[in-house]
Amino acid sequence: MTATRLPDGFAVQVDRRVRVLGDGSALLGGSPTRLLRLAPAARGLLCDGRLKVRDEVSAELARILLDATVAHPRPPSGPSHRDVTVVIPVRNNASGLRRLVTSLRGLRVIVVDDGSACPVESDDFVGAHCDIEVLHHPHSKGPAAARNTGLAACTTDFVAFLDSDVTPRRGWLESLLGHFCDPTVALVAPRIVSLVEGENPVARYEALHSSLDLGQREAPVLPHSTVSYVPSAAIVCRSSAIRDVGGFDETMHSGEDVDLCWRLIEAGARLRYEPIALVAHDHRTQLRDWIARKAFYGGSAAPLAVRHPDKTAPLVISGGALMAWILMSIGTGLGRLASLVIAVLTGRRIARAMRCAETSFLDVLAVATRGLWAAALQLASAICRHYWPLALLAAILSRRCRRVVLIAAVVDGVVDWLRRREGADDDAEPIGPLTYLVLKRVDDLAYGAGLWYGVVRERNIGALKPQIRT
């Protein structure tokens, strides 16, 4: 078996949202959407959308399906928890640390105290049902440095990084470790959910729309895809892979987790997001702290753009879709007609690309419509989040622009509320659409302010440059 070959017994399952075209000659889906044509031999290996690796041919097909993002792994049991060391960076959060350690029974744990005012000591964990080692930084070096210190002391094949304000749910580790049956997987992340029920509107909003919660759909981690990164609040990594890329960048005060993900991908590793595994996070729910945190996240975009100029575009859109919506927003009869012409030409181009896959007119129409709608949602989000200072200026100067911005703000908020409400826990306290819409706009204003501040600080506009595809 080669170093990257999937092992026998490993299975993949075609995503339920992927469309099977014709008699199974092609698959349409993935993120971004693509058309994958299948040879007759490949079709014969798939059984109800599932493929089990038995030999070199099936292993190669499974890898193709995974890399095309049209299928997800169904691995056999993975490494043991004894192969994992948990690294916890902490600073001035003794209560959260105790809560976390209590949930880590039977695991080896390294606590890295990053210059706490009241230093963490080994005696603080008397009676804990895990093997704990405490390391100290005499003064704070930041979470990235604390994680690297823990990584340097780790002797196991795998390392789990958990922040001190999280608490894993039962079965989290086993659900993640299975993915490492794929020898190319370097990092797997769980879904981050809320630790406590909503005590105020901000808490209820965070339970539905936390920046750390990447949703309920499993996915590969790839730039410009559904899941473009995973937060380091909770991740499990292959120790050797993290060391090979130099660990976390200690010069970054925010966005170091995004940077690590992208450096691993650039090195040829594969990353997975596994929402079956749940880790609860103690969200900031006081309004001032919450706004400051959103701005802090926005401030990471510009430093990331300096390091990864091809991965930080706030808007990735086709030129045709962009032009169609610009013309539509003009609001004149001629503009709407031109927009319709562009939409028809887009449909014809899609039809030509799909002509070898036994597709119907409805298939082409569905793909074109979904593409234009996705582009509209991207534009609405970007107007309200990344480009809101420009949108505000345009709205002040132009009545027509004011109408466009208002429509974008409402559509973006309502659609996002509807989507996220579907994935909410049944016992979660609901948040109404109006409250959600207001907080979503505050969220975007804070993030955008941090983004623009970072752009000025770094003197780099890469985080604002859209990526327009032909």
From Swiss-Prot:
Coiled coil, from the record: none
Keywords on record: Cell membrane, Glycosyltransferase, Membrane, Transferase, Transmembrane, Transmembrane helix
Membrane topology: Single-pass membrane protein
Keyword Lipid metabolism annotated: no
GO cellular component, one term: plasma membrane
Pfam families: Glycos_transf_2
Family: Belongs to the glycosyltransferase 2 family.
Protein name per Swiss-Prot or TrEMBL: Pre-mycofactocin glycosyltransferase
Gene responsible for this protein: mftF
